[in-house]
């Protein structure tokens, strides 16, 4: 809701009477939906047969933009500055754990030459299918949120509550910062703040937000100064 954008996805739970349903009451606010399972596959999605299904489906965001049947409101929820420089410990690697296994991690390793974080999964480089190069991220936000398994859901589906407030961690320019997040209404933008109360400023570039259970910790390794 806070982005006023279409929901682009490839299937999902569709039991209309369950809170997890991508077509249920919780999704009633969606203005435009593009679902690769239900008819949108041929126009907006394709599969890379050299990669293992089901995680080999891709889309073209320029084509998605052509699908708008309404005029979206231009929103700019983040502050950016190419001159921003934070003090703090220099990060080497960020470890974000999965519940599927104790040794299963998404990692981001800081590359000082590019000033970006390179993504890997379980120790293997996460390669961009379009460029055949490791995925690089300029800014990383870890947003801790209340996460719980839905009652009586045999598949263990989870709900993440993104309304309210909580702690957050930021990784910008190789530095590790801590702070908070706040979202007063579902349609309002999520605001991120540093420990001193100042609103977060990011470096120009792509920004990835990881929603993380608020009762679990991430691990960070630092470089020697």
Question: Where would I find each of the regions flagged by the language model?
Answer:
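A surface/extracellular/periplasmic glyco- and lipid-processing/surface-interacting theme
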Residues: 1-225
């Amino acid at each position: 809701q806070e982005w006023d954008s279409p929901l682009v996805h490839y299937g999902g739970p569709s039991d209309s009477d369950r809170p997890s349903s991508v077509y249920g009451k919780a999704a009633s606010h969606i203005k435009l939906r593009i679902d690769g399972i239900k008819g949108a596959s041929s126009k907006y999605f394709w599969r890379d047969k050299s990669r293992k299904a089901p995680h080999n489906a891709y889309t073209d965001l320029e084509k998605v933009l052509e699908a708008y049947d309404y005029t979206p409101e231009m929103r700019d929820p983040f502050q950016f500055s190419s001159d921003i420089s934070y003090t703090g410990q220099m990060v080497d690697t960020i470890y974000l754990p999965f519940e599927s296994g104790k040794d299963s991690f998404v990692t981001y390793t800081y590359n000082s030459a590019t000033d970006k974080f390179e993504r890997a999964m379980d120790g293997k480089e996460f390669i961009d299918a379009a460029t055949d190069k490791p995925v690089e991220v300029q800014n990383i936000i870890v947003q801790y949120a209340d996460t719980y398994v839905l009652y009586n859901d045999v598949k263990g589906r989870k709900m993440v509550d993104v309304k309210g407030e909580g702690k957050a961690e930021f990784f910008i320019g190789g530095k590790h910062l801590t702070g908070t997040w706040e979202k007063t209404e579902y349609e309002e933008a999520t605001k991120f703040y540093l420990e001193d109360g100042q609103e977060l400023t990011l470096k120009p570039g792509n920004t990835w937000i990881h929603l993380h259970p608020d009762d679990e910790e991430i691990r960070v390794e630092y470089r020697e100064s």
